[in-house]
Amino acid sequence: MIKWVAAIIGYSMLRFPGAILGFVIGRFFEFLSQDSIRIRTSSYSIKPEIFQLNLLSLSALIIKADGVVQQKELEFVRSFFIGQYGKERADSIFRTFNTQIKKETQHLDQLTRVFIQQTTYETRLQILHFLFGIANADGHISDVELQKLSQIASGMRLRLPDFESIKAMFVKNTDNAYKILEIDSNANQDDIKKAYRKMAKKYHPDKLRGQDPAMIKGAEEKFREVQKAYEALIRQKNN
């Protein structure tokens, strides 16, 4: 916005050369006004430390959902954070969580509200994908964990077909590929191809450019699952 105002002022003073100069100067001030430590996409902005601590808080809700803290689930979260942020940063996140946040009661609606207000829909899809990974770390997702995941998805205002699509990646049954592509089992090849294009666009990692690296990795995994589901259904239809 600043660059355009500056361009107009420049034009009124020096005509076309002034417009160019005003645009450049305005763009420079816009750059200075951006907080470089924020994760940004369109009109959404969230500080990395806020994102990471809230993500860890949601992780804790899943780990404690069935009343039993599984070591594999703890290791999954720790390995994930170390892999995405490095050991030093991950240790700092865990320290802050343990000393400042863990002792407090975590309210689901407060946590999800942060993500609704400060992240894109695509980012929230990847958060859900990550949480499913935690629940499945011990090789099984309990009904209680599924219920908690459903509550989180609802709290983050995710569509039911999107929830079912991600769920199908972890809870296996015969029509998983259809659920991943969010189509009916009676779909023909044209329906499958159309659904694939839609899902590939929705989950393409490029849509999360500039977002937290952990969410980009989740998008890449989901994108691969969409491709696998599409290929499986096309093979099935051709047989």
Identify the residue ranges that each predicted region occupies.
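Small-residue-enriched hydrophobic alpha-helices in membranes
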Residues: 1-64, 68-239
